[in-house]
């Protein structure tokens, strides 16, 4: 990828060749991964790690780049004014955003050898307070978006991601604020278990409207695993002319449970979570394996989707699987599995025969 001049939109006009030449891979798994590593409070889900342990955040960006993510998304998800108010830390709003943006910019400007140029994305997301027919609340949300977009532009973001919207009108409002900045936009929606937006729009209607309003990339992210996201990506890709994004969660969602919020654990669990549901801290046995994620990436890539990633639950191994499934060799490919050398299951002639024979009963 060759970064275009800052005055040139990334996904349109003269810079369209950038997008055509190489797929864009976006790791969006920061929230769950930071919680797993002990640097983020589950339930609150606020990216305080940017201020408290910036070196940890920088390292995770680097790990995702090593695995193939050529987009470095600033970890400002849930770092908006409303969420900071809920945890009584609204005074840290701007410092958190600016530090997260600067860390992402630093990593994008210093990609690992073998990755190529990385792009840095600012981020705005679901406010969790949007209400239909409530102009006062809607104005408040737009103001929240506006300040975060402003900071992202000032910290030299290449484009802005607006993500995880389950109200169509909120997604439209996010796009409106991004467009005011002059930066390219990626807008991804996250319909919940009713398989429609909470304000009544269908998934396809919402995506078509986003394209009409000028979004550069439109698609789905979060909540849905590969099985329940793929059918909608197929529909969207057929209808939309703009670029399409697909970023599932790595969990085995089903037709009965299309999102990860109410997934049951039928795997013999004898110690359920204290809050009574698998989401968000007891979903470990419900994860997709890496090959399922790779298969999803290959399927959507073959449909013509070139903006691909993995959302909550992603780890670097998932991102590498995405990259390799669509034909890329990335720095982490150096450590791709090599079962031929395994002490029981390897095919190498140097592996003792008696150990190979023992493999099926080990």
Language-model segment annotations:
Residues 13-362:
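Domain-level signal for soluble alpha/beta catalytic cores
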